[in-house]
Amino acid sequence: MKKGVMRPGHVQLRVLNLEAALTHYRDLLGLIEMDRDEQGRVYLKAWSEVDKFSVVLREADQPGMDFMGFKVTDDACLTRLAGELLEFGCQVEEIPAGELKDCGRRVRFLAPSGHFFELYAEKEYTGKWGIEEVNPEAWPRDLKGMRAVRFDHCLMYGDELQATYELFTEVLGFYLAEQVIEDNGTRISQFLSLSTKAHDVAFIQHAEKGKFHHVSFFLETWEDVLRAADLISMTDTSIDIGPTRHGLTHGKTIYFFDPSGNRNEVFCGGDYNYPDHKPVTWTADQLGKAIFYHDRILNERFMTVLT
């Protein structure tokens, strides 16, 4: 947390049919519906999250991600980072408090990769859902579906990875946890973190700007991932790959699609990092094993289906 950016806070997704998407994210993934607003957006959270929402669904003509938000320490930090983003050369816009329900003012910026991100300092604190703050039980007993624990990260496809790396490391205080490099030393994927997590956001080199690969949610155990696979089959949900293990981050994972075609991941495990750790490097000739550790073969759909 070198620059005051603490953690991923929310993601706003575009969906083609709001009620179908809500059934998916609420009843299958197990997120909790927290609110709706006058624009028709739906606000959800995972049970262990302390702020009011982490996922916002907006009905639109095309699927994809509108923006991903990160929480900063306080309003002074937000003001300082807005200035540094401008100095870096980013397109910056201030979104007033309340535009997202019960969220403070936000500073939105366009990364060189073509994705919109935003920073905010304040959001209504609702505490963990379904358990008390004093003498809490282990977990709520009436969770649905996969019982997602938290919104964990997003993976983006876009160009200008080096400039995006410089923005996230120099201005926002992320560090490089893991990477894939070509023979000539060019980095073609970068996994960036703010904490001891394997990553909080990741970028893959792609010819088009602003493409969205997946939104990821954390589960506690491998048995939970297998149970998620059962639920995917029970509900005839479109599956992408898994259950399997990544070489990158070593997370145990399964990927599937929401009704609009946005890719979701649920996973458990994964690597950890401390400040004295060096980045983990994979070479491009081992990309199959890096992505799918067991099969060691690239899956064309996984690599090319984007929103």
Swiss-Prot record:
- Signal peptide region: none
Pathway per the UniProt entry? Xenobiotic degradation; toluene degradation
Q: What cofactor does this protein call for?
A: Fe(2+)
Binding residue positions for Fe cation: H153, H214, E265
Domain annotation VOC: ranges: 7-122, 150-269
Provide the transmembrane region boundaries.
none
BP GO terms, sorted? toluene catabolic process
Record keywords: Cell inner membrane included? Answer: no
One GO MF term attached to the UniProt entry: ferrous iron binding
- As recorded in UniProt, its EC number(s) are 1.13.11.2
Which key words are in the record?
A: Aromatic hydrocarbons catabolism, Dioxygenase, Iron, Metal-binding, Oxidoreductase, Plasmid, Repeat
- The answer, when asked if Oxidoreductase is one of the entry's keywords, is yes
Catalytic activity entry? catechol + O2 = (2Z,4E)-2-hydroxy-6-oxohexa-2,4-dienoate + H(+)
Which family does this protein fall into? Belongs to the extradiol ring-cleavage dioxygenase family.
Q: How does it assemble?
A: Homotetramer.
Q: What is this protein called?
A: Metapyrocatechase
Q: Which source organism does the UniProt entry give?
A: Pseudomonas putida (Arthrobacter siderocapsulatus)
Q: Which taxonomic lineage does the organism of this UniProt entry have?
A: Bacteria, Pseudomonadati, Pseudomonadota, Gammaproteobacteria, Pseudomonadales
